[in-house]
Amino acid sequence: MLSIKDLHVSVEDKAILRGLSLDVHPGEVHAIMGPNGSGKSTLSATLAGREDYEVTGGTVEFKGKDLLALSPEDRAGEGIFMAFQYPVEIPGVSNQFFLQTALNAVRSYRGQETLDRFDFQDLMEEKIALLKMPEDLLTRSVNVGFSGGEKKRNDILQMAVLEPELCILDESDSGLDIDALKVVADGVNSLRDGKRSFIIVTHYQRILDYIKPDYVHVLYQGRIVKSGDFTLVKQLEEQGYGWLTEQQ
């Protein structure tokens, strides 16, 4: 599904990613961990298509297509979803209008018929019930006045509606209390269907107690220096990153 080979990325002429390689197959959950400044969020931003991140080497393919040649909008159309650490607030735009516009843009890109407001309302009722979310979430402005937990619920709702093939969560657990953390975990777990893949970028181990990843990767100085299964999370929890960084 996603194949990253020897990726090099710079920001303001400073090299951040220095030869990162990663393969993600359908249905897999990959956790990306590492100390501050290791390049975790740079990887997320690059996959999402942020313009201020300059790819200076390597390749990224998604479903056989050159991802780096696609605009952020086309990446969304191809099935990539990005949940940012700090979701954007959009005053005056209701969640329902935002989601219908986003979904119909994706459907148009794929050559599918767009949904009118009645069909979309039926879809929203189904997703709201599935995720056990409050219905008033739809009438409120996008993320305006939302608590941390409500913003994360909104991310999960967007994922459920857009049905992406690859979901990237960029430090979505940062600053959350345990209840909000469980909202994120429950939402992700409810969307795991054996086909949809996830990349969970996190500085902490605690969210991975609720979302058990198939693979765990440690990023350090712009490269993946260690990969393993969930036991690597426990090892990092007990020993920190020092034992890995000292080997580099």
Curated annotation (Swiss-Prot):
Protein role: Has low ATPase activity. The SufBCD complex acts synergistically with SufE to stimulate the cysteine desulfurase activity of SufS. The SufBCD complex contributes to the assembly or repair of oxygen-labile iron-sulfur clusters under oxidative stress. May facilitate iron uptake from extracellular iron chelators under iron limitation.
Classification via NCBIfam families: PRK09580.1, sufC
Q: Which organism is it from?
A: Escherichia coli (strain K12)
**Segments forming domain ABC transporter:** 2-246
Q: What is its main location?
A: cytoplasm
Q: Where in the cell is it found?
A: Cytoplasm
Biological process annotations from GO: iron-sulfur cluster assembly; response to radiation
- Protein name, as recorded: Probable ATP-dependent transporter SufC
